[in-house]
Every structure is written in C-alpha cells, then in structure tokens.
Design a protein with these regions (language model features):
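Alpha-helical transmembrane segments
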Residues: 109-112
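Polar-ligand-bearing catalytic/cofactor-coordination segments
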Residues: 1-101, 115-116, 120-190
Length: 190
C-alpha cells in the first residue's frame, strides 16, 4: 500500500542484552531494511507492529535518513572548519600569553571553545529528530488510516522501556531525540 521497496525485515535478538523494545529503519539504495527487536514482537499485537513498521517506512518516505546524513556532514564540516582556524592560530596563542605554537595546545583550546558550539548543534539536531518522529507518526496514521494502533504501540513501548510520560520541557528540548509519548499521542489525535 505504501510502495516501500525492502529486501527484508530483520528480527534483532535484543532480549539477550535488554528487556527494552525498539524498531529502526536503516540503509540506502537497494540495501534498505527495517529491524524489529524480538522483545517488540513478543509484546505487541499484529496491528501495533504494522503501525510501528508504517512509522519506520515513514522515515524512509520522508527521507529522514538522507536529511540526517546531510546534517551530520554539515556538522562535521563546521567542526573541521573551526578546527582549521584554531590550529596554530597566533592570535589565540597571544591571547593566552603563549610564545610557542603547539598543536597540543591548539587542540586543547579547540576542545574547550568548541564545546558550546557542539552543544548548540546537538539542540538543533535533537529538534530536527523530534520533528522527524512527528512526521513519521503522521505518515503511519495516514497509511494505516487510524492512529489508534500506533497510540497503543507507543503506550506499550513506554511501559516496556520505562519511559517518562511527563518529562520537563527543558529536558526534552536539551536532550530528547524523540518527542515525549504524550505529545506524540496528542498529535495523533489531531
């Protein structure tokens, strides 16, 4: 129904390492695949699993993997550009009253001064990731023609993974790559 060319759906033996459940989409070109943890399959109904798979297909259809790669390349490019500015920068050494240039000192300066930039980029990356999750949820709802099964699946995932239903908004903004489940459920009701 959603025209998703996939070579296989893998079942990951996650129960050996954890009781948590998960599913993910990965791959490019002809090597696309969806992986479902065995714990996910054990604890969810067929309808919930179909909606979770539709959510993962949504990531593909909305090109979230490509956008993630582009974002990663841009972030890495920014890091290397800034690193090139810091390496053996005579003005930086003069500001710290250092007479001799040192690659080690340059790397130390860079790591200290780059940290706030990296923090800001992580906030941006998390915000984009949360937006992608809402988009994949909406795709699943449209594909399955109901959000009910995905809502039930999200509830089960939260119970299984001991998720926090009401995290502080600042915590979400700073560190969550996925929106809180209650926000996702509210969005699916709209």
């Amino acid at each position: 129904k959603v025209h998703f060319p996939i070579s296989r759906i893998d079942v990951m033996d996650g129960s050996r390492r954890s009781s948590k459940s998960n599913a993910y989409f990965s791959g490019l070109g002809k090597n696309k695949r969806i992986a479902l943890f065995d714990t996910l399959i054990e604890k969810h109904s067929v309808d919930e699993l179909l909606s979770i798979i539709a959510h993962e297909v949504g990531h593909y259809k909305k090109r979230h993997n490509i956008k993630g790669i582009v974002l990663g390349v841009v972030q890495t490019g920014i890091m290397f550009f800034l690193l090139s500015i810091f390496l053996n920068n005579t003005g930086l050494f003069a500001a710290f009253k250092m007479e001799n240039l040192s690659i080690y000192a340059s790397l130390l300066f860079f790591s200290v001064l780059y940290s706030p930039i990296e923090l800001i980029m992580s906030f941006v990356g998390n915000a984009i990731s949360r937006k992608h999750e809402f988009e994949a949820d909406a795709f699943a709802k449209k594909s399955i023609e109901t959000g009910e099964h995905l809502i039930n699946g999200l509830k089960n995932l939260t119970v299984t993974n001991l998720g926090n239903l009401t995290p502080h908004p600042l915590t979400v903004w700073m560190s969550y790559s996925h929106p809180p489940v209650l926000d996702r459920i509210h969005a699916l009701f709209d």
